Amino acid sequence: MSTPSSRSQAPETVTTGPIQGSEKIYQELPNGLRVPQRRVNLTNGEYLDLYDTSGPYTDTNAVIDLHKGLPPRAGIVTDRGTQLQRARAGEITAEMEFIAVREGVPAELVRTEVAAGRAVIPANHKHPESEPMIIGKAFGVKINANIGNSAVTSSIAEEVEKMVWAIRWGADNIMDLSTGKDIHQTREWILRNSPVPVGTVPIYQALEKTNGDPAALTWELYRDTVIEQAEQGVDYMTVHAGVLLRYVPLTAKRVTGIVSRGGSIMAAWCLAHHRESFLYTHFEELCEILARYDVTFSLGDGLRPGSIADANDEAQFAELRTLGELTKIAKSHGVQVMIEGPGHVPMHKIVENVKLEEELCEEAPFYTLGPLATDIAPAYDHITSAIGAAIIAQAGTAMLCYVTPKEHLGLPDRKDVKDGVIAYKIAAHSADLAKGHPRAQLRDNALSKARFEFRWEDQFNLSLDPDTAREFHDETLPAEPAKTAHFCSMCGPKFCSMRITADIREFAAENGLETQEDIDAMLARGMEEKSAEFAEHGNRVYLPIA
């Protein structure tokens, strides 16, 4: 895997070991596949099995060799067409069986959603290291984490560690957006060691080959770059084929113009040559290439709004209409398709985006960057965007592209990646709860029960981030006895509402108060006792001071 230019940057170690309070388990399938899960063992003898994206990196029995890469999964078929074509033919593939167990749904539901184009399974034949997953509104909301170097900073080793770190905390997919040196080598290291699907934006590498000159781009150069990446195993590719020459002037009066890197590159090419982009004119040829590998289209929103002021404008929706036309063409070639969405959108305009995407794009899975619900919080855009992400996911978006605290400010580091993933896991899980996903509330119920019963270790271990939950608790109550105390430092021992409620329940149990009738009877007896006491004192309201 190493080349002379990349050996010095090659990763030697990454984060491994189980997440606190958990162990890696597998559900064995008849076809030889093993579906991963994370089991949280509770102190009351119970356990909860969770959807797991961390790959073998949290398996204590796994041997990790970054130079060899991960072992390929069994049962990969490369000669029967794409997952879409096979689903339309009525076939439940090995990947669909795997996903059905992972999601806790019937395999036929997986097949029908893929056949209808409402879900995609990004699984390039050349990426056998990945564990099959699905993106579609009938399933759990997924999150994508962007990593990748820039011309200014980062190394191959750092990007591989970011990938492992992101999936440890719940990233379902990774996009390698490298724009600096060693793009091919960085992607190779990530792919060979990634148990989740990997996406790219091929135009970035193509532009690097022209030394950064958009006007020098050609269809042949781009086509060769796509084939190069598909051969490596890239599972889905962002293609900004909807940026048409006539749409570029629509952005002239925007506050922030064109903010998509890919969109701006293609807009510059269109203006330089004064014709439609080669991505649009050669789209059918591109479909044929992607179909050979079963690479999924992620049709890019090159004209997405980059500010609240530009949300839902003419340029954005004009491009979306074109993406709808391209979706039909891609499906006719048997290529799986998802649609990328904004961006920066105020809360009251968010749902309109989902409705219009589903109408124009035949309900292809929607994949959105946030959206940010306000522009005023640099350094906190993982929060501003998670607000919009939760709303748009509840409305039907299938996958959320995370935003880190460094958005608009710089290249995210390891801590930023974790903060972004956790913020988006909150948004995705909140949407799953609202949509009634069959497994979503089990975790909430388990944690709430642990909280009420003061099982602190279980509270930590059931949380999205056990390490930080424990750290925050121990800042003020670090002693080991505090892990069984019936209070925390917020309320102290006298004012804890849950302890008081527990005392009330104990009192009720001791006095046989199980129903409302029992309570009413107790109150009546109490009133009778007080009435008798009042009579004993002469029925006087005021008594002399003793």
Curated annotation (Swiss-Prot):
GO molecular function annotation: 4 iron, 4 sulfur cluster binding; carbon-carbon lyase activity; zinc ion binding
Keyword Lyase: yes
Keywords: 4Fe-4S, Iron, Iron-sulfur, Lyase, Metal-binding, S-adenosyl-L-methionine, Thiamine biosynthesis, Zinc
One example of a Gene Ontology biological process annotation: thiamine biosynthetic process
Residues covered by region (Disordered): 1-20
UniProt pathway: Cofactor biosynthesis; thiamine diphosphate biosynthesis
GO cellular component: cytosol
Matching InterPro entries: ThiC, ThiC-associated_dom, ThiC/Bza_core_dom, ThiC/BzaA/B
Record: residues binding Zn(2+): 344, 408
EC number: 4.1.99.17
Cofactors, names only: [4Fe-4S] cluster
Catalytic reactions of this protein: 5-amino-1-(5-phospho-beta-D-ribosyl)imidazole + S-adenosyl-L-methionine = 4-amino-2-methyl-5-(phosphooxymethyl)pyrimidine + CO + 5'-deoxyadenosine + formate + L-methionine + 3 H(+)
Residues given in the record as [4Fe-4S] cluster binding sites: 488, 491, 496
Domain of life: Bacteria
Uppermost EC category: lyase
Segments of skewed composition (Polar residues): 1-19
Annotated substrate binding sites: 146, 175, 204, 240, 260-262, 301-304, 340, 367
Pfam name, any one: ThiC_Rad_SAM
Family to which the UniProt record says this protein belongs: Belongs to the ThiC family.
Protein's job: Catalyzes the synthesis of the hydroxymethylpyrimidine phosphate (HMP-P) moiety of thiamine from aminoimidazole ribotide (AIR) in a radical S-adenosyl-L-methionine (SAM)-dependent reaction.
Name listed for the protein in its UniProt record: Phosphomethylpyrimidine synthase
Organism name: Mycobacteroides abscessus (strain ATCC 19977 / DSM 44196 / CCUG 20993 / CIP 104536 / JCM 13569 / NCTC 13031 / TMC 1543 / L948)
Gene label: thiC
